[in-house]
From Swiss-Prot:
<dbReference type="Pfam" id="PF02594">
    <property type="entry name" value="DUF167"/>
</dbReference>
<dbReference type="InterPro" id="IPR003746">
    <property type="entry name" value="DUF167"/>
</dbReference>
<protein>
    <recommendedName>
        <fullName>UPF0235 protein AnaeK_1146</fullName>
    </recommendedName>
</protein>
<comment type="similarity">
    <text>Belongs to the UPF0235 family.</text>
</comment>
<dbReference type="InterPro" id="IPR036591">
    <property type="entry name" value="YggU-like_sf"/>
</dbReference>
<dbReference type="GO" id="GO:0005737">
    <property type="term" value="C:cytoplasm"/>
</dbReference>
């Protein structure tokens, strides 16, 4: 998948985030990125916190293993997830 790659022993994910959705879920690829809908609003970092929590649970890693590399205030985000491969991340999120 174009939205996931291995880099330095971790998976790097390119995401497109839609805050204030009806529920939190991964909905598929959009513009070369994995689109994730978040129920949280984009206020005071709530959407970023919800994204980290969603990815940690979905990928079976600790929240501390999920780091936002780029896109703190935008919809297009790059996230690094330690302790998992890109292939495992794709399998967990694309299903």
């Amino acid at each position: 998948m174009a939205w996931a790659r291995d880099e330095g022993g971790a998976a790097v994910l390119e995401l497109l985030v839609q805050p204030r959705a009806s529920r939190t879920r991964a909905v598929g690829e959009h513009d070369g990125r994995l689109k994730i809908q978040l129920a949280a609003p984009p206020v005071d970092g709530a959407a970023n916190a919800a994204l980290v929590e969603f990815l940690a649970v979905a990928l079976g890693v600790r929240r501390a293993d999920v780091a936002l590399l780029r896109g703190e205030t935008g919809r297009r985000k790059t996230v690094r997830v330690a302790g998992i491969t890109a292939a495992a991340a794709v399998a967990a999120l694309a299903s």
